[in-house]
Amino acid sequence: MLFRSAIPGLPQKSGKVRDVFDLGDKLLMVVTDRISAFDVILPCGVPDKGKVLNQLSLFWMEFFGMKNHLVTANVDEYPAELKPYKEDLRGRSMLVKKVKMVEVECIARGYLTGSGWKEYQKSGTVNGMKLREGYENASKLDEVLFTPTTKAAIGDHDEAINFAETVQLVGEKTAALLRDTTVSLYSKAADYARERGIIIADTKFEFGLDADGSLILADEVLTPDSSRFWPVSSYAVGKNPPSLDKQYVRDWLDSINFNHQPPGPVLPDDVISRTREIYLKAFKDLSGREIV
């Protein structure tokens, strides 16, 4: 298990799960086995989680064929200065181009659940958009919704923004491109996943901008950390389906009345073990592969 990575001499920034090292013209992204919930990094890791996130992101980048920030994920092709760390990096890292990241998190919702369901119950809206009456928890939406948020610093919460606010942040052309690309990628992935027995209820994409203004798919793509995955076999409208994602950990934390503030509690061994099983199953069901 890798909870924290360190490469002496290289500038480093750490997110909730990823450690990013600056190599000058490129970045090394290392996906650790850390896990966060409710924007709180928990003090224990989940073995193989980082490998699942990294390798599933690589799978989807290949699947979409869209321009992305990947240079290589083959550690044998990494710069010589990384050679001493090769085995720690294998399977859980990628070398990527530096791109100008768009400061909007792009969420696609195909089903009404989570915060969207809570808002709909109160006001009949999701992200301020009025929806028809009659939806239940976990209902499939009539159309895929684009519900962007701001990008918050670690420990802070992302704030939902509407399309007009997205335009104010990034301009009308880029906002429309973010919306259309997010919905298109989600729809393509959702059709594929359903054939593999998984419903993608919602997911989050992040994009960068190339020098010519075109979008680049970046960061993580359709992982159990950034998505809600439901088995088709146990899906039913009106109740929360069991999930193949981080929801299992969130539910356990709520069951012990965790207040969603740091420090987070240590997860029991059985919760860690079950979380690992969930992540590995999501990877295998979606990709048809085993992690390496």
Named regions from a protein language model:
Residues 1-149, 260-266, 270-292:
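Active-site loop/lid in soluble adenylation, ligation, and acyl-transfer enzymes
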Residues 32, 89, 188, 215-224:
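Catalytic cores of nucleic-acid ligases and guanylyltransferases
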Residues 66-70, 188-200, 213, 287-292:
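Surface-exposed helix-capping loop/turn segments at secondary-structure junctions
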Residues 97-99, 195-203, 208-210, 276:
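Short, active-site-adjacent segments that bind or coordinate small-molecule cofactors and metal centers
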Residues 108, 200-221:
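Conserved metal-phosphate-binding beta-hairpin within the catalytic cores
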Residues 139-172:
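A short mid-domain helix/strand-loop element embedded in enzyme catalytic domains
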Residues 170-201:
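A long amphipathic alpha-helix within ATP-dependent nucleotide-binding catalytic cores
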Residues 221-282:
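C-terminal helix-cap and adjacent tail motif
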